[in-house]
Amino acid sequence: MLARTLVEEGLRRFKKHRNGPLEMIAITGIISDYASIERTEGLKRYAMTDKKVFLRQIIPASWKADAAETGFELLKKRFPKLRLVWTASDVMAGGVIRAAEKMQLNPGKDLIVGGVDWAEQGLQSVQQGKQFASSGGHFLEGGWATVLVYDYLQGKDFAEHGLSWKSRMGLIRSSDWGSKSEMFQRIKPDNINYRKYSRYLHPERDSYDFSLESLKSGEYMVNGN
């Protein structure tokens, strides 16, 4: 999702100055971390199928901004035509942005940067236009998992609905910040009434709606907000 979004924006932004595929680098977390592996594998699968992008190199930065900053500086010198930077976290995207500005680049114009997590600094950078996109929402999975455990302990087995869930992340771009920012700002753990997801507490529910879309109506929010 994030990689495709960066490529689509790159094709739009640099169409007059492009000769060949867009050059991209990726900065991932700790190479042995499950989240890092999953996100990087998704990126590689996408890059292999889209001939409009050339994934130059993937480097680890251990989820640290300063490591991402140093890594970007080295790779930008190695690949001067670099246009797209995919990072596995908003924290590392912040390091890339800092490095780019030190190199007299203009993130959001000369360079399209994306990250993951909906971290506060990432959303701020998206709002400012320095980071084009942030993918996130996976922090909700902990609450949803707790709902399943609660229901099971109350005698409401969830096996018939599946034993494995992988929720889709949401995406916010700088280009649609104005129309979506209010909803994204509301999607915080303290604003969500997880009790409303429980099929034990709400036997009228036929299934579990563990999705970001479920939050749009306000039904699952505290006080319906």
Stretch-by-stretch model annotation:
Residues L2-L6, Y34-V53, G95-A99:
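Short, solvent-exposed amphipathic alpha-helices that sit
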Residues M1-L22, A67-A68, D117-G122, H138-Q154:
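Hydrophobic alpha-helical segments within soluble ligand-binding/sensing domains
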Residues M1-E9, A26-T28, I58, Q128-F139:
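Short beta-strand elements at the ligand-binding edges of bilobed clamshell
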Residues E23-I27, R56-Q57, R83-T87, I112-V116, ...:
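Structural recognition of the beta-strand scaffold that forms the well-ordered cores
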Residues I27-I31, W144-N225:
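Hinge/cleft segment of the Venus flytrap/periplasmic-binding protein
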Residues E23-A26, K44-A65, G108:
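Short beta-strand elements in bilobed, periplasmic/extracellular small-molecule ligand-binding domains
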Residues L43, P60-Q124, T146:
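Hydrophobic alpha-helical
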Residues T28-E38, D90:
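Extracytoplasmic "Venus flytrap"
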